[in-house]
Regions:
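Class I S-adenosyl-L-methionine-dependent methyltransferase catalytic core
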Residues: 1-185
């Protein structure tokens, strides 16, 4: 079923209300319902291409509003998990975890670590994966106390991030950060 932008916004707000109020369980709403309903901010910018002189100008404004948010489809997350085959002792991180789609396919929730900048997506991830170690933070400030066996994720793309090393594209910064937090081979 395809929802309009307005319907998606309203559904996202209802999900957040259920989590904030603690009424999801008492109303019979399951974690699976929350997982399937919350879509995040991607595509909810309300911009129209016709209002911009170029596709580039439209795309830049869209990136600014959405902050690069796009939740990885569950089938892709499942494929990644099946390809990696993490064991029950492997510790897995997603440095821009969104609502935690990759965690859904990991063998042990308490071995999942995530960082998320968007407070709403973080709230949903925390609700869905209460055993995971999640941090509401910018990936650039994320300093975990341990190293990981695997880093999975779908970083924001083509955002210009300013770091102590200068300007970097977000996806390249993600790769550098992943290398820093992975266990040595």
């Amino acid at each position: 079923m395809d929802l309009t932008r307005e319907q998606r916004k309203a559904l996202n707000e209802k999900v957040l209300y259920l989590i904030d109020s603690g009424s999801a369980e008492e109303t019979g709403i399951t974690s699976e319902d929350i997982y399937n309903a919350y879509t995040g901010e991607g595509g909810l910018h309300g911009l129209e291409r016709a209002d911009f002189d170029s596709y580039h100008a439209y795309s830049e404004k869209k990136k600014e509003i959405e902050n690069g948010q796009f939740f990885t489809p569950p089938a892709i997350c499942q494929l990644v998990a099946e390809s990696l085959r993490p064991s029950i002792s492997d510790v897995v991180a997603d440095l821009t975890c969104g609502k935690g789609n990759f965690f859904n396919f990991m063998p042990v929730e308490t071995n999942c670590y995530g960082c998320e900048l968007d407070a709403r997506a973080y709230k949903v991830a925390h609700f869905l994966y209460p055993g995971a170690s999640l941090e509401l933070a910018d990936i650039r400030a994320y300093k975990p106390d341990l190293r990981f066996d695997f880093v999975v994720g779908n970083p924001p793309f083509n955002l210009k991030w300013y770091t102590e090393d200068g300007e970097r594209l977000s996806q390249l910064y993600y790769c550098v950060k992943a290398a820093q937090v992975l266990k040595p081979l």
